[in-house]
Structures are given as structure tokens and as C-alpha cells.
Amino acid sequence: MEKPYAFTVHRVRRARRHRWRWAQVTFWCPEEQLYHLWLQTLRELLETLTSRPKHLLVFINPLGGKGQGKRIYEKKVAPLFTLASITTEIVVTERANHAKESLYELDIDKYDGIVCVGGDGMFSEVLHGLVGRTQRDAGVDQNQPRATLVPSPLRIGIIPAGSTDCVCYSTVGTNDAETSALHIIVGDSLSMDVSAVHHNSTLLRYSVSLLGYGFYGDIIRDSEKKRWMGLARYDFSGLKTFFSHHCYEGTVSFLPAQHTVGSPRDRKPCRAGCPVCRQSRQQLEEEQRRARYSLDGTEEVEEWKVRCGQFLAINATNMSCACPRSPQGLSPAAHLGDGSSDLILIRKCSRFNFLRFLVRHTNQGDQFDFTFVEVYRVKKFQFVSKPAEDEDSSVLGRGKKRLGQLCSEHPTSCCCRASSSSWNCDGEVLSSPAIEVRVHCQLVRLFARGIEESPKQESRG
């Protein structure tokens, strides 16, 4: 073969454990005319793929996790973006809420998406900036709990580089930077629910993963005081909170998700191309169409349920919350885009039983199969704590006198109760224990496709 002509095609190669790898194939042509024909045809085909981003805004948290965010982006992500002819504008954040403030000020219409390099905290900051900017531009008051929020046309890409990468792990199946970069390049799109958390008609925060009161709230509140410990603070605070074994009294009111398919205990996880999320999307579009043309204006009667008592933990998850330590997550069958949240109530129990409950999260066991655990799929919920001051003073006095004796005589069943806990909202502490939560169906989109079921593997890489 004289004067062969060659061109190289860059592609995605599937590896183990939901990881993707960059690969390339070189083609040789015997004739120059055929060579140019192939190049022209491939370029024309790529131009038709309008879902692929061409210009991205990238936020890098240089301090997240082990402080490797900038290095991870430069070594693993930037070269792939260059190969894909994606141009970027990079902002290295210098303070808390830098990314959020930037999204309120920048001209974001010129970008095809927003990329955040960091952990769940960095993603949350970008989420709040993008959702808040979209509502401001649309004239929607975020402080109104009944407001219908407007979804943003921009997608968010997550390059995992934090201490926790729960959102990335639950939407891609791994916390691997190269895999996430390739999902961005091919233009994947995944719609995801967002919960709005209010107190007294004031928006506190948005949540996409975990809202936790009691156990998880105490952990995050205690760990904030020990940032000098680094990542070890989470393990230390977790152990301390477990042995403290505090219970909190309150009332949970919730609106069951009547029209969603499935239940939290059906053992059917959310996967790529999920039919449950697809059906929810169709229902959402139908509701929007009816609202636009004022069809069937009668409002659905809301039948709220109420649960009272002493709780070790109250958790609400919009996704499985899977992570390397808990591969199945807090609620294995939670769906990313069905317009609902799985509300998990862990009532007062012994330390041993609570330990059994926690251990179930690390294996294939059903963590809801306990008499002290209740789980519901809900669209909205409210919580009001019962402060100690509301109790009868004589009962409270007698309790204080006998507290030490009871704890020493029954150490396994002791449930010392403080006045109130804090809410852990995607890793941030909320100021008020009394909250009102509403799930907004598929409010944001990610550069992801969901966890693929038994992906084909081309190698062991």
C-alpha cells in the first residue's frame, strides 16, 4: 500500500463497575479521496448531534475533598474536552457561595452547560445558583412554598473530587472523573427531582439527596465544629452520635405520592431509561399542558397523614444516596425523577437494634424490615419538633433526677432526649427544626444517563 491515509476516531469504552474509558481506533484508507470522504461524513454526523455541548462554564473547588480538584480537572478532564473540541471558561472558587453568586451575575445563555469540579457541596452551590437564577429571570418567588418552579434549560455536569460524591455515584454509578467527563462529552441528559425546604414562607435550601433529622442531623452539626480533623471528622462525629443515642419528639405530616408507580420496598432500583421516571415525565407534561390552557381547574384533594412520637432519625431521600460505603444507599428503590421523596422514620429503639439497622445499609439486606422503621413515598411533608419546655414541669423534673440512674441501669435501651436536633440538608445544617418540604418533579438536568443495568464490558480496565 503506497501512501496510506489514516484518521483516528476517539470513542467511549465501557469498563467494569460502570466506569467509562477513553479509547481510540485508527482507520487506514488506500486512497486520498476515500480518506476525505470519510472525514467529511463523520464531521457532518457529529454536527447533527445537537445534544453535545460546545461551550461550558466550569467551576473548580480547589479545597474540596483532599484539595485535588484542580489537578483532577487538568489531568483527567481538560484533555478530553480538548479532544472533543469543547471550549471552556474556568472559575476557580475563592470563597463559599462564589459559584452561586457568579451564576446570578454572569450571562449564562452563552453556555451549553455548567460543570462543577468538587463534591456534593460544590454541586449544591451550583444547583442553588442555577435554580435561583432561573426563578429570578422567570419572575417566580422562591419563598412561596406553593410556587411552581421553572426548570433551567442548562444541564449540570459533576466531576467528582470531594469528600462525598453521593449525587455523582447515584446518577452515574461510580465516582470516577474520567467517566463523568465522557458523559458530559457525549451529551447525556438526566432529569432529577429537587425538594424545596421552607420555614415560615422563607426558602431555606434546596435538596436533591438527603434531608436528615436526628442521627444524620446531629452528625453534620457536630462535624462542623471539627473541621480541623479533615475527613476523619465524619467518622468521629458518627461514632459519637451513635453512642449519644438521642431521641427527638415531634410530629411528621406528609402527603403520600398516590400516582407514582412502585414503592420504597419493591426492590426495583432506578436505572438508565427508567420507566417510572419516564411515566412521571409524561404526567408532568400533561399537568403543565392543563395548567397552560386552564383545563380541569379542580384541585386534587390532599389527604395528609400524621405520625407522632420519639424518633432517632427522620430521613427524606430523593435518590438512593448510594456511595462506596453503602452501595445500595439509604433507600435503594428511590427514583431520581418520579416527583416524590422516600420518607424514612426510625422510631425509638435500643442501640443494638439501631446498629442492626445501620449495618443493613452495607449489605443486601432490607433496611426497612424492622418494627421501629417506617417508610413512605411522599410528595410533600412537614415536621414540627416538640421542645422540652412544652412538657409538664413535674414530669420533666422527675426525669432529670432519674436520668443518670436509668442510663446506667439500661445502657442498651437508653434514649437520652435533647430538645431538638438539626436538619442535615445535603451536608449543610439548617437553622430551624420546623420545616415544610415539597418535591419538584424533574426540576434540573444533569450530564448523566442513570446507572446502566449490567453494562457491557469491553475490558477489565
Question: Could you describe each region identified by the protein language model?
Answer:
Residues 16-18, 35, 65-68, 89-90, ...:
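Eukaryotic short linear interaction motifs
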Residues 71, 93-95, 101, 108-111, ...:
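Catalytic core of DAGKc-family lipid kinases
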Residues 3-7, 21-23, 52-58, 84-87, ...:
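Core residues of folded domains in eukaryotic genome-function proteins
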Residues 19, 23-34, 48-51, 65-69, ...:
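Short amphipathic alpha-helical molecular recognition features
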Residues 41-46, 100-103, 141-145, 180-181, ...:
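Eukaryotic intrinsically disordered and solvent-exposed regulatory patches
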Residues 11-13, 29-33, 42, 46, ...:
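Residues that form ligand- and interface-recognition hot spots within folded domains
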Residues 1-117, 124, 128-146, 453, ...:
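ATP/NTP phosphate-donor binding region
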Residues 1-30, 34-36, 306, 327-461:
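ATP/nucleoside-binding phosphotransfer catalytic cores, i.e., glycine-rich phosphate-binding loops
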